[in-house]
Amino acid sequence: MTQELGRIERPSAGPFQEKRKLLLVPCLYQPPDNAEEGLAILDRYWSQVRSQINSLEMKLGQILHVYHENLLDTGDEGVQKLELLNAEGSALVRVICSAGANIEVIEDEELLNESLDLQRCLMMPFMSQKVGTSLQEWFLNTLHKRYAHISSKIDETLKEGEAGLLLISERHQVQFASD
C-alpha cells in the first residue's frame, strides 16, 4: 500500500472574484502535413481547453476580454482574420465573443512586423558571425518591446473584477502585473 505524502487543496474561487483574472491558453497550430494523428491531438487539445474555460468561467466569472497574439483587428473582422491565423482557436473565440466578450488588440503593428521580419532573416545561414549576432540582438530587443507592449495593453483593458483570455505562443515572455 502506498503512503500519501501530502494533499494539495484547490483554493476556492471566492478570494479571486473581485480581482483581475487572466486565463492563458498556449496556442497550438495545425501540423503542416495535416497528419491524422496530429489533427486528432489538436482536436483533443482544443476540446479540453473549451472544457476548462467553461469550468473556470462558472467559478470565476464570464470572460469579457479576448487577447490573441498577432491579431490587429477587433470585432467580426478580428474573428475572420483569426480564422486564418488560428482556425482551431477561432472557434473558441467565436463562442466566447458571442457570449459578450470583446476582442482586444494587444499588438503594435510595427513591432509585430519587425519581429516577424527579423525571425525570417534569422532562418537564413550567415557567413558572418557578427551579422548573425547583431540580428539576434535586434530580434531579442524587438521581442522585449513587443511583449512589454502586450503587457501594457492587457493592463489598460482588464479592469478589477473582470476576466480575460490570452491566447499566445507557449514561448512568450510577457510579464504580467503582480495583481
Question: Positions of the model-derived regions?
Answer:
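Compositional signal for N-terminal targeting/processing segments
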Residues: 1-179
